[in-house]
Amino acid sequence: MIFSTLEHILTHISFSIVSIVITIHLITLLVDEIIKLYDSSEKGMIAIFLCITGLLVTRWIYSRHFPLSDLYESLIFLSWSLSVIHIVPYFKKKKKNLSTITASSVIFTQGFATSGLLTEIHQSAILVPALQSEWLIMHVSMMILSYAALLCGSLLSVALLVITFRKNRNIFCKRNPLLNELFSFGEIQYMNERNNVLRTTFFSAKNYYRSQLIQQLDYWSYRVISLGFIFLTIGILSGAVWANEAWGSYWNWDPKETWAFITWIVFAIYLHTRTNIKLRGANSAIVASIGFLIIWICYFGVNLLGIGLHSYGSFTLTSN
């Protein structure tokens, strides 16, 4: 009873902190100069991480099994994994300009998990026979860690595409017929030369910053996705061994397994494109962006179906 109450308290605290951090992030998007707000949001992310950790430990003790048996528990663990990816660069004092992407992932996932939409599966239950195995921690944790890393890496690639393909607004008009009537040829030539100098200086600084940001996004998306791909491979292989012990077959092509294989193929293609210098950058980022959608279909969309050998981790949306 005590652990159940503590879990309930931590759930509401984490949701409250998420709401506060969302507000702070919205303010920092409007006012970039307020450094104290940025520090407050980062401290809020650390508080969220501590709450999620306490929530997982409490549920583990209360349910007497590792909290990865259903969608709600896996969402909490996914939030924890995303928060780890977020706070590690923060403590190393690196890549603050990339923290907004990882922070948004944590806020969205934890906010959804604790918002009350999954109230029906919040209560802990006895594990079904298929999950009463030592492979539960190995397989499911590796899969969730891979989802977290691949989602963050894919979001970095999406940001890379947005910055790359965003068109520059031409703040200086190239031709103006009215100038030809009001000014002489020499005056027009002088004004054009001055505008060209200003425009060149402005866009040179802007393009330099943009190129540096694109390089950072490309660099970190590749490394985070590579880490996630390793986790995904380990998760699929451990799941195959577990499936052979439980069902007598390494692979059964149920919806979850099929989409996990599709996810693996997509990110294998991404890593393959990275070996070609000509395909790096925007081309490989497009593949990673496709992978972002595939991950959500594999992790969340398949659970809505409630069919297949992994149906015990699903849920159904019911109306009152």
Swiss-Prot record:
Assigned keywords, A-Z: Chloroplast, Cytochrome c-type biogenesis, Membrane, Plastid, Thylakoid, Transmembrane, Transmembrane helix
Signal peptide: none
MF annotations from Gene Ontology: heme binding
Presence of the UniProt keyword Ribonucleoprotein in the record: no
Segments traversing the membrane: 15-35, 43-63, 71-91, 98-118, 143-163, 224-244, 251-271, 285-305
GO cellular component entries: chloroplast thylakoid membrane; plasma membrane
Chief location bin: plastid
InterPro entries membership: Cyt_c_assembly (IPR002541), Cyt_c_biogenesis_CcsA (IPR017562), Cyt_c_biogenesis_CcsA/CcmC (IPR045062)
Subcellular localization, as worded in the UniProt entry: Plastid, Chloroplast thylakoid membrane
Membrane topology of this protein: Multi-pass membrane protein
Tagged with keyword Thylakoid: yes
Pfam families to which the protein is assigned, alphabetical: Cytochrom_C_asm (PF01578)
GO terms under biological process: cytochrome complex assembly
Assembly and oligomerization: May interact with Ccs1.
Role: Required during biogenesis of c-type cytochromes (cytochrome c6 and cytochrome f) at the step of heme attachment.
Family per record: Belongs to the CcmF/CycK/Ccl1/NrfE/CcsA family.
Designated name of the protein: Cytochrome c biogenesis protein CcsA
Lineage start: Eukaryota, Viridiplantae, Streptophyta, Embryophyta, Tracheophyta
